[in-house]
């Protein structure tokens, strides 16, 4: 990895990616590195390793492409956030993005709007498949898959089985009931807001589109 430290008396820069399809490149100014209790630094280093996956695997992996031919890839930011909080787990529930997670948790896990907030699904997948699973997911993704499509292929599950897993994930996250999260999540169990709900047929409720 190439690390470039820039001295800008009044500048703020933190950028992690790569260069020439060969190697990860981290660019920082001294004022940016320690921001957010060093989370910014760890996040951008995560991006460098993400770029390196693309370099090492011939542009077919690592989501340097836009999944499904769309625009953007929220999983890049989600995973960089998650990687940072594996270094600083005490901050995973105490940061500027956690409230955004609570407000948007009902949305699809790859939704673009809360791309910096959805950094918990990775913990669930590692809980089920081991800590090295995220590395496998990044290295073995195939253009034009998104992260969910790659996950389902690698784990060999159906749509119905994936939906069952998402229910299990949501049920566990109600009390942060997985080993990686239970210690620091214990104080946040009662933090979830209740989104606006609409009663529909057969005594079911669904989240209002206004949410």
Question: What feature does the model see in each segment?
Answer:
Residues 1-72, 90:
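Juxtacatalytic substrate-recognition/specificity segment
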Residues 2, 45, 77, 117-119:
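Extracellular structured ligand-interaction cores
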Residues 31-36, 40, 70, 74, ...:
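Soluble non-cytosolic domains of exported or imported proteins
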Residues 44-45, 49-53, 83-91, 126-129, ...:
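Sec/Tat-exported extracytoplasmic proteins
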Residues 56-59, 90-95, 128-136:
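Substrate-binding/catalytic groove segments of enzymes
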Residues 64-112, 124:
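Post-HExxH zinc-binding segment in Zn-dependent metallohydrolases
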Residues 79, 83, 117-163:
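Extracytoplasmic, non-cytosolic globular domains
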Residues 144-211:
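Beta/coil-rich, acidic/histidine-enriched accessory regions frequently appended to metallopeptidases
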């Amino acid at each position: 990895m190439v690390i470039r430290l820039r001295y800008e008396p009044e500048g703020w820069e933190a950028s992690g990616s790569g260069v020439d399809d060969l190697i990860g490149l981290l660019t920082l100014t001294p004022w940016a590195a320690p921001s957010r209790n060093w989370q910014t630094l760890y996040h951008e280093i995560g991006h460098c390793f993400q770029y390196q996956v693309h370099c090492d695997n011939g542009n077919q992996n690592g989501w340097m492409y836009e999944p499904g031919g769309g625009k953007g890839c929220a999983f890049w930011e989600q995973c960089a956030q998650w990687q940072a909080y594996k270094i600083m787990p005490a901050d995973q529930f105490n940061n500027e993005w956690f409230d955004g997670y609570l407000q948007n948790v009902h949305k699809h896990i790859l939704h673009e709007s809360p791309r910096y907030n959805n950094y918990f699904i990775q913990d669930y997948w590692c809980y089920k498949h081991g800590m090295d699973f995220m590395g496998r997911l990044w290295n073995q993704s195939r253009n034009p898959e998104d992260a969910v499509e790659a996950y389902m292929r690698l784990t060999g599950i159906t749509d119905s089985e994936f939906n069952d897993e998402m229910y299990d994930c949501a049920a566990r996250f109600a009390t942060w009931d997985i080993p990686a999260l239970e210690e620091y999540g214990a104080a946040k169990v009662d933090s979830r807001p209740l989104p606006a709900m609409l009663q529909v047929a057969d005594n079911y409720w669904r989240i209002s589109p206004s949410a």
